């Protein structure tokens, strides 16, 4: 016999399928509800313009890349990476691999090539154990790697949008971003669940 779902996982599934943004994404045949988070950020911060080059970290299942394609057009370029596989999206150059691995990072940088990137975006998150003392440091490690990517490829005056989980290390990370960008906002999109610790740091005007 199969194992029964725990009460917490059953509650999560119930909440997930009742989520209006999940239902809306399903109706519109979108990859995920994350599409709407980025749309809200774009409406307020205007990060994406036609012809831009964008790096998407933690891309699967593809909600953010799917959205950005609609904003940057045929002349734009998206280089996406995730440890999980992702179904192809026209206009997206996808690399499957663990971004923490030096060889995967080298392959990603090779895909970027000589181009300077206009926007680096990261929706990366670790597999959560339910223990904040374990989960928050893992999450902070990923967002530090995303910021390191900015330092390597982001064009002067470029932008960075990153999902961060509030907890130990958050304030220091925010301070570091403020030292590198001219304008920094912390956003909590409507499609982000209220009880989630996640927020999105939107940083523009990279000092280079």
Swiss-Prot record:
Q: Specify one Pfam family.
A: FtsJ
Residues of the active site: 163 (proton acceptor)
Q: Name one GO cellular component term.
A: cytoplasm
Q: What is its main location?
A: cytoplasm
rRNA processing keyword on record: yes
- Reactions catalysed, as given in the entry: uridine(2552) in 23S rRNA + S-adenosyl-L-methionine = 2'-O-methyluridine(2552) in 23S rRNA + S-adenosyl-L-homocysteine + H(+)
The record's subcellular locations are: Cytoplasm
Q: Where does S-adenosyl-L-methionine bind?
A: 62, 64, 82, 98, 123
Query: Looking at the record's lineage, which domain of life comes first?
Result: Bacteria
Query: Any idea of its EC number?
Result: 2.1.1.166
Entry's Gene Ontology molecular function annotations = rRNA (uridine-2'-O-)-methyltransferase activity
UniProt record similarity statement: Belongs to the class I-like SAM-binding methyltransferase superfamily. RNA methyltransferase RlmE family.
Q: Which HAMAP family match?
A: RNA_methyltr_E
Q: What does this protein do?
A: Specifically methylates the uridine in position 2552 of 23S rRNA at the 2'-O position of the ribose in the fully assembled 50S ribosomal subunit.
List the protein's name: Ribosomal RNA large subunit methyltransferase E
In which organism is this protein found?
Answer: Mannheimia succiniciproducens (strain KCTC 0769BP / MBEL55E)
Q: Which gene encodes it?
A: rlmE
């Amino acid at each position: 016999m199969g194992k029964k779902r725990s009460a917490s996982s059953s509650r999560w599934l119930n909440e997930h399928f009742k989520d209006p943004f999940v239902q809306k994404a399903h109706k519109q045949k979108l990859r995920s509800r994350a599409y709407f988070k980025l749309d809200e950020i774009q409406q307020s911060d205007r990060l994406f313009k036609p012809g831009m080059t964008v790096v998407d970290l933690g891309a699967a299942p593809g909600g953010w890349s799917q959205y950005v394609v609609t904003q940057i057009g045929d002349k734009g370029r998206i280089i996406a990476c995730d440890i999980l596989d992702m179904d192809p999206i026209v206009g997206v150059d996808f690399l499957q691999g663990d971004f923490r691995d030096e060889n995967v990072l080298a392959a990603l940088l090779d895909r970027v090539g000589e181009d300077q990137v206009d926007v680096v975006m990261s929706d990366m998150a670790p597999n959560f154990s339910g223990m904040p003392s374990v989960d928050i440091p893992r999450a902070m490690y990923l967002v530090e790697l995303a910021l390191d990517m900015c330092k390597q490829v982001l064009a002067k005056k470029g932008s960075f949008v990153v999902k961060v989980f509030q907890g130990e290390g958050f304030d220091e990370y925010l301070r570091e971003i403020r030292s590198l960008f001219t304008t920094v906002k912390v956003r909590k999109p409507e499609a982000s669940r209220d009880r989630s610790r996640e927020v999105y740091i939107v940083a523009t005007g990279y000092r280079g």
